[in-house]
UniProtKB/Swiss-Prot annotation:
A single GO molecular function term of this UniProt record: nucleic acid binding
Pfam family, one: UPF0102
NCBIfam families per UniProt: PRK12497.1-3, YraN family protein
Lineage: Bacteria, Pseudomonadati, Pseudomonadota, Gammaproteobacteria, Pseudomonadales
Domain of life: Bacteria
Family per similarity comment: Belongs to the UPF0102 family.
Record InterPro entries: Restrct_endonuc-II-like, tRNA_endonuc-like_dom_sf, UPF0102_YraN-like
Annotated source species: Pseudomonas putida (strain ATCC 700007 / DSM 6899 / JCM 31910 / BCRC 17059 / LMG 24140 / F1)
Protein name (Swiss-Prot/TrEMBL): UPF0102 protein Pput_4400
HAMAP family: UPF0102
């Protein structure tokens, strides 16, 4: 069987993250929300808080693991995209918000649980 493409593997990781977060009580507001500033993998609601979730998948940790791939530049793009989301979806603008990261690593995640970091970074 052929290996999954990086795009397909990333989509599978997003689906796994979404299902996990929904199981934790979060509600999906948007998936793969795109704008000029970038893309938000998942936008979810946790009680009254709008949660911008970046899903990171890495097959190997050779160049740094999934969590290590969220550098300052990526954080700035996420903050910009989140700001644009809140402008466009103004009814969410008065809600508190946070940035979470869900990280998965390994082929079929090698039996490892995903890592969910709430408030992964400040904006």
């Amino acid at each position: 069987m052929a290996a999954a493409s990086p795009t397909r593997a990333g989509q599978a990781a997003e689906t796994q993250a979404l299902e996990y977060l929904q199981g934790q009580g979060l509600q999906l507001l948007a998936r793969n929300w795109r704008c000029k500033g970038g893309e938000l993998d998942l936008v979810m609601l946790d009680a009254d808080t709008v949660v911008f979730v970046e899903v990171r998948y890495r097959l190997h940790a050779g160049f740094g693991g999934a969590l290590d791939s969220i550098d300052g530049r990526k954080q700035k793009r996420l903050v910009l995209a989140a700001s644009l989301f809140l402008q466009k979806e103004a009814h969410w603008g008065n809600h508190p918000c946070r940035f979470d990261v869900v990280a998965l690593q390994g082929s079929h995640h090698a039996g490892r649980p995903l890592q969910w970091l709430k408030n992964a970074f400040e904006c």
